[in-house]
């Protein structure tokens, strides 16, 4: 038998039929819905007189538009001040009620960001195809699943047929070998990858992360890396199944039980790339070479190590790249050759589908403990990715650590990752953010976003500017 990649295996498991034009009909195991991309899809079902093909394959939760202050959440739907946002959340509630779809509503203890809720509920399982009307659905690939975002029209197709038409992509492997240095995280790995291959590097590919450094990551770390595969240009990101994958899934609400569990584990254990499998593109990094990363510009590929300087367009030979650097410098209000550590900040955001899980909050709290948010920081937000993450953090006392340090402790939601709810940047404000995109206006009109890990964000909050978190944590923490 021909050696196959993980992507090849997942594709073959779900290919219903192959069409003459080279596309295939692919079966979808899990569909996750939120309030922004689903209203028109549900309306399409109504107009056509259809019902969802498999109601139990769908779960939903509002996340993009929900407010994150306790007072606003306690006020229910009427507390959502923006009319469009309120209507979208209300419409999701009504649609899920009408069609019988399980929804974790805004004040349900299980509510949260779709890409946090799916895995923690066990609704994301190894070997599945998972789709959602959100580009960061690649997150779920951390479980050895074939997961990607879809548009609103495709949301309707999945609801109606449980299938999608797709063309198979090329295979790409990113190998990270070696031991991660002290203070370097999954977020730093994926930012370094994007810095190396660019935001178009993975175009047309399904990207598998592999290597000894990837295998040592927790499931939370693997989700962070797969989450940002889309920023590397790849629609799909994935990590092969191993004992960590299976241990994470075991006992979760949607996970199989009894004999079904044993059968599932037997299948899941085969979801690895064969040793001689062919990859169209292979990218290699040494873990020892990666340092804490900070994005400086208006694209995730504009990223540098903490000890570097903002680039100088005058020495860039490529005119297109030179223009891009000049525009980014102007928008970000930075100067050529400025040290990354000299970038002063206005706000700090710890959250998003990239970095809002319990491991992320523990890492940030370890830095914040016993320190205070710098007086120059206008606001430092910590937004858990779900109600269950929030409850776990509070059980561990992390909320008290953050509050004592001067951070705000919020309710779950997408929050400041994107300007679709009250948590926004003002024009010209610099933010150290654990989110995934730093485009112009992403966090608010004129806002300036710098992508970092949770530990780096916490270090920036207590310093007022970017610092190497390893210096704050001290050499003794290495032991």
Curated annotation (Swiss-Prot):
Q: Where does [4Fe-4S] cluster bind?
A: 353, 414, 417
Q: List the disulfide bonds.
A: none
Q: Which pathway does the record list? A: Amino-acid biosynthesis; L-leucine biosynthesis; L-leucine from 3-methyl-2-oxobutanoate: step 2/4
Task: Give the Enzyme Commission number.
Answer: 4.2.1.33
Q: Which residue ranges traverse the bilayer? A: none
GO terms (BP aspect): L-leucine biosynthetic process
Domain of life per record = Bacteria
Coiled-coil region list: none
Q: Which UniProt keywords apply?
A: 4Fe-4S, Amino-acid biosynthesis, Branched-chain amino acid biosynthesis, Iron, Iron-sulfur, Leucine biosynthesis, Lyase, Metal-binding
Catalyzed reactions per annotation = (2R,3S)-3-isopropylmalate = (2S)-2-isopropylmalate
> How are cofactors bound according to the entry's free-text note?
Binds 1 [4Fe-4S] cluster per subunit.
**InterPro entries (UniProt xref):** 3-IsopropMal_deHydase_lsu (IPR004430), Acnase/IPM_dHydase_lsu_aba_1/3 (IPR015931), Acoase/IPM_deHydtase_lsu_aba (IPR001030), Aconitase_4Fe-4S_BS (IPR018136), Aconitase_4Fe-4S_dom (IPR036008), IPM_dehydratase_rel_enz (IPR050067), IPMI_cat (IPR033941)
Cofactor (UniProt): [4Fe-4S] cluster
Q: Which GO terms describe its molecular function?
A: 3-isopropylmalate dehydratase activity; 4 iron, 4 sulfur cluster binding; metal ion binding
- What does the UniProt function comment say about this protein? Catalyzes the isomerization between 2-isopropylmalate and 3-isopropylmalate, via the formation of 2-isopropylmaleate.
Q: Which PANTHER family match?
A: 3-ISOPROPYLMALATE DEHYDRATASE, HOMOACONITASE, MITOCHONDRIAL-RELATED
Subunit structure, briefly? Heterodimer of LeuC and LeuD.
Q: Which family does it belong to?
A: Belongs to the aconitase/IPM isomerase family. LeuC type 1 subfamily.
Protein's name in the database: 3-isopropylmalate dehydratase large subunit
Species in which this protein is naturally found:
Xanthomonas axonopodis pv. citri (strain 306)
Gene label: leuC
